[in-house]
Swiss-Prot record:
Coiled coil: 190-229, 521-577
Family: Belongs to the EXO84 family.
Annotated Low complexity bias: 70-83
Name of the protein in question: Exocyst complex component EXO84
Covalent cross-link Glycyl lysine isopeptide (Lys-Gly) (interchain with G-Cter in ubiquitin), where: 193
Region (Disordered): 16-101, 247-271, 432-495
Recorded name of the encoding gene: EXO84
Compositionally biased region (Polar residues): 23-42, 438-447
Biased composition (Basic and acidic residues): 247-256, 448-460
Gene Ontology CC: exocyst; hyphal tip; transport vesicle
Subunit note: Component of the exocyst complex.
Function (record text): Involved in the secretory pathway as part of the exocyst complex which tethers secretory vesicles to the sites of exocytosis. Plays a role in both the assembly of the exocyst and the polarization of this complex to specific sites of the plasma membrane for exocytosis. Also involved in assembly of the spliceosome.
Organism: Candida albicans (strain SC5314 / ATCC MYA-2876)
UniProt key word Ubl conjugation: yes
Pfam family, one: PH_EXO84
Amino acid sequence: MDNLDPNSSLQVEKLRNRKSRAVWQNNNTTTHNNPYANLSTGEKSRSRHNTGSSYVSPYGGGNGEENAYTGNNNKSNTSGNLLQVPGAGGGGDLNSNKKQSRRMSIHVSARQHGRSFSQTGPIDMANLPALPKIGGVTTSGVGGAGGDVMTRTGGLTIEQKIFKELSQGSAAEVDDYYKTLLKQKNLITRDIKDNINQNQKNILQLTKDLKETQEELIELRGTTKELYEVLGYFKESAQRRLELEFEPETQKELHSPQKSNQLGIPSNKKKDRSSIMVLKKMWDSQLQSLFKHVDGASKFVQPLPNRHIVAESGRWFEVNVGNWKPSYPTHLFIFNDLILIAVKKSSSSSQEPTTGGSNGGSKSRLQAVQCWPLTQVSLQQIKSPKKDDDKMYFINLKSKSLSYVYSTDRYDHFVKVTEAFNKGRNEMIQSERLLDSRLSSPSNNNGDSKEEKRQLRESLRNSGNYKEGVTDDAGGAATGGGRKSAGTPNRNSTDYVLHDISARVHSRNRSQDLGNNFKLANNGKSQFFNEIKTLEDRLDDVDVEISHNQYAEAVELISIIESKLRNIENALTNQRNGGKNVNIADELLLLDVSKLKIKNRKENVSNGLIFDLQHNIAKLKQDDIDNILTLFDNLEQLDRGVQGYLDSMSAYLSTTVSKLIVGLQGSTKIDVVNYLSNLMVINVSIVKRTIQTYEQIIAPILKRHGDVDSSGLINWCIDEFTKLCKQIKKHLYGTLLISSGINMETDEPIYKVKERKLYDNFLKIMQPQLEELKSVGLNVDYIFESILNLE
């Protein structure tokens, strides 16, 4: 191009003075890069997608590069603003040159305006992902330290294909190849995402496995520690026993001549009691293992002191009495005071009793379903009506309203369960009898107050037969320097003391009657004495009525006896105040003793009435409650009767509500709303019933005594609904309510409604119930204000 003719120079000058220039000549730089050919130079490219190679400038860049369209090595000796047509120096078709110029104009314009397939930055060839196999294209991984990605099509890499094939190709071919690379990129991106997701899942699973392993190791560590402790206890116990057994002969000889040992009195040698500690430790371990392996056992069994498992058996099946076929694998746990029934959650256990058992089914967890105290259930062996069930053993568990039949194929398991049940039940019955005898013993009776003992001592002093040490404030009796009678174990009781006093007074009076019979008859002393004695004997009839739970007859007899004793006391008082020289000390003493006996009978009657209220309140009708409270009024203990009635209603309310709690575990939000609605309805109905009973029965009795105070009832209602409000908040929080902060004034959490629809449904149940309370004169809206006004 150095030897241009003058005509060519003139033509160049005309082109230079053109008013309209091509788009790519708006840039004043000397070099014009093809957007498809700048990858190898490291410059920024705005191509559609990095194709891995670069194009040589088709219109001469002044850098000695070969023209990609003409193959000529054109040197530019003119300004970069000249309009140079590709291939102008080498001839060629003018139309094709115009097409090439237009195509390059489009691409350069797209590059300048940042549109279409242009890019904004260089491509990092070292971090390109591996391309998947598509058609005949094969990919090679990252090799060596450089990690060049090789995509071969017929043995050519991407760069080689661009330089050798696409450099002479059209824009359509370049665009097609770009689309091919774009598909490869999408496939690679998808594979990368899939690999990332899979790796994340593997990491999560590994984390979960590690956590479970850690928990098992911690549990194993604790179990091992407990095992070493128990082994240590056993070792210490064995060492102590060996020391006691192999005691030196000299020590045995020192103990042998003692009279205490010859008389059978145990020596003061220190005993080994470590086995008790080991036993309690084993019992605690059993309960912990039960709570761990039996779901729901903690709801039925409380870890009380000395509660332990006596026997357990898993070779049982619950029997359908309709067809006498086994239905559910069952595990029986016999405690010293309870019997717990558990079933397997999984249904994959064996259904045949001959093949099923604790080891025959799947290793599924147990679910506790029933639990009764041993004294409230009976266990009996029954026989199946089928003749082919001779090898099976059946038992029937009966409670008040439920009955279950269980079967086993093992006689040893049958014997183990029945013997453990009978042993535990008999021990419980015996302990309850001992407890009842202690409670009913007058030495522990609430009626033995200090005032009664003081009156008894005064009566004894007045009679002249008082001895120091007969009674003390602790309720014991020690006569004559602290000696106790070993023949009568209940001699220290108040009843025995009262009976002894009565007997001595009777004996003394009879001896006086023999010597002064006529004199006593003249002053009327024998008449009063005999009347008091007759009335005192009628107290035995009161005891008979109390033992038969005939409290109305007992109260009637007590009222008659009290009335007659009151008349006798008035007559004796009139004689003493009349100035007559009459000795009535014996009559007054016997009268005081009779009063104390009557007071004890009243206490026994009131205890029986309280027992009926507490245990039969759900079955008692209005007339029965009226009779009980009337009896309390006749005994002059109306306050105790009213309080006992309110306490029994509280216990009945708690028992009724506790039956709903079992079904709440693991429930949904709708179940929580239903539970709280039932809770509200039950509380309102029972409180409403209590208020109506109070107004119909108790209020008229109080009115007869001139007392119209009902503050006790109001306080009871407020306490019950305060507990209900706390319970409702407890279940609403986390399900329908969320906490949004703390109230600085009341130091209570501020709640907000999370599930508005369910919360409104609950309010639709709650508000009518509160309106029902207003119909009986009770307004407790202020207690539930924090729930009703939530937003």
